[in-house]
């Protein structure tokens, strides 16, 4: 590197210059959006160990954000209702991302502020604590590298972010959905999967962190407003990395002033109810037999090319389409599978709410594409249904997860039988909601157990009988 290049970004190279910069901002107030953004962009590329003046990096979760607040901007972090830069109305949020074979994705949800059930229910969206604190955010991103110490991490971009109109309409609906449960005395039933972009995630030292709610004597889990990791993934890709936009279902935010996103989808596909898959292909001009055919058909119904799962709204909300074929007797043949799990990684998961299964299932809204069997044996498009797992049922999945983890830690029993090898992982007969079994037919596709033995890949499933009941309940 030549001298001119070295001098172009002296803060990255010379620690003394960095220290001088840090001293200069001690006690400084940033009162305009422009000055805040300018200061934020000056940190880009600097190892965080060279920023940290207080030793915060040695502490737990949230340390990186605290380091930037204290050591870079020179103010004491607060967890109050005001934005971090109250004069400018800007909230500072540091968001990590992961780089993988499928591109960039957010490492986690973006937690905003604690929901005070006793106060928030009496507000409008525009006067809510969420909107007051987070309507404009300074988003600072960094790549999380599992094999590197935090001191090596570097902020790579900083932007001022305000919600685009098309997102804001959905976020306002999400806020209203959360408040409807609080006003109905059901804050204890809140779930991340209730909503699309803005969620009420659990927030506390442990599962016993609870708060009073206004219309019920039952304590409710402490929760915070948060932006789902699926939403943050799209924000990072669009606004930080400038990646190409995905096709949108909602062409104008005005559409969502009178109906919810789910209502809009249901209305658009209703004219196609009662048609077989082949009839839909002819009607919509689709010449495909791909595994994702039903997703393609739904996208066409909504005037979108490609798969519905690849639309901007479905990606932001993390909505997963699932085709369900209901037999004429009301039964469903197939249970609903989740991704296969790694036995060793699963055995090391310490808490349910930090587990891979919880963070897949709890915040996810599914769109069931339901085909009903007619008397002649043909299956016709019956309806779409947006669904997320109720809290009580999520607790039953928790129990199945707990027993699975304990069984793997103790040592799975593999028993040779005339029909093959059986095991003592939770079976469908043991729970009304979930079970564990192999995902595919290939018994030779195996992964190592913690004790070194090899075992056919397994995954969690929601029981077919459970899904049938969930569909039946809302008809």
Language-model segments: which ranges?
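Nucleic-acid endonuclease domains
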Residues: 2-475
């Amino acid at each position: 590197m030549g001298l001119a290049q070295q001098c172009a970004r002296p803060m990255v190279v010379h620690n003394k210059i960095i220290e001088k910069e840090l001293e200069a901002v001690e006690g400084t107030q940033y009162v305009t959006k422009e000055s805040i953004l300018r200061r934020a962009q000056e940190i880009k590329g600097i190892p965080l160990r060279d920023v940290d003046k207080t030793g915060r990096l040695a502490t737990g979760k949230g340390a990186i954000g605290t380091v930037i607040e204290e050591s870079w901007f020179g103010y004491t972090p607060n967890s109050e209702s005001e934005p971090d830069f109250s004069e400018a109305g800007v909230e500072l949020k540091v968001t990590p991302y992961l780089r993988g074979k499928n591109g960039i994705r957010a490492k986690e949800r973006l937690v905003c502020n604690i929901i005070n059930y006793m106060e928030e229910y009496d507000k409008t969206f525009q006067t809510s604590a969420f909107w007051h604190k987070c309507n404009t955010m300074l988003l600072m991103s960094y790549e999380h590298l599992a094999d590197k110490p935090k001191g090596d991490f570097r902020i790579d971009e900083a932007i001022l972010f305000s919600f685009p109109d098309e997102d804001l309409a959905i976020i306002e609906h999400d806020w209203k959905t959360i408040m409807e449960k609080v006003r109905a005395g059901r804050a204890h039933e809140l779930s991340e999967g209730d909503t699309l972009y803005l969620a009420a995630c659990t927030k506390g030292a442990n599962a016993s962190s609870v708060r009073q709610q206004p219309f019920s004597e039952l304590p409710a889990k402490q929760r915070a407003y948060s932006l789902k990791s699926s939403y943050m993934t799209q924000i990072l890709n669009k606004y930080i990395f400038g990646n190409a936009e995905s096709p949108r279902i909602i062409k104008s935010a005005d559409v969502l002033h009178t109906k919810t996103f789910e209502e809009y989808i249901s209305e658009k596909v209703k004219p196609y109810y009662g048609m077989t898959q082949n009839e839909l292909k002819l009607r919509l001009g689709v010449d495909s037999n791909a595994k994702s055919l039903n997703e393609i058909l739904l996208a066409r119904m909504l005037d979108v090319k490609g798969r519905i799962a690849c639309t901007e709204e479905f990606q932001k909300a993390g909505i997963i389409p699932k085709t369900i074929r209901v037999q004429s007797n009301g039964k469903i043949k197939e249970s609903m599978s989740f991704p296969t799990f790694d036995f060793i990684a699963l055995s090391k998961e310490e808490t349910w709410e930090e587990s891979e299964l919880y963070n897949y299932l709890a915040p996810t809204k599914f769109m069931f594409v339901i085909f009903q069997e007619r008397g002649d044996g043909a299956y016709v498009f019956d309806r779409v249904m947006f669904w997320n797992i109720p809290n009580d049922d999520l607790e039953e999945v928790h129990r199945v997860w707990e027993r699975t983890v304990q069984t793997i830690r103790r040592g799975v029993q593999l028993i040779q039988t005339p029909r093959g090898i059986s095991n003592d992982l939770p079976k469908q007969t043991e729970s009304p909601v979930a079970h564990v079994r192999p995902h595919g037919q290939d018994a030779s596709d195996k992964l190592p157990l913690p004790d070194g033995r090899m075992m056919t890949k397994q995954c969690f499933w929601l029981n077919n009988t459970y899904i049938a009941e969930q569909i039946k309940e809302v008809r």
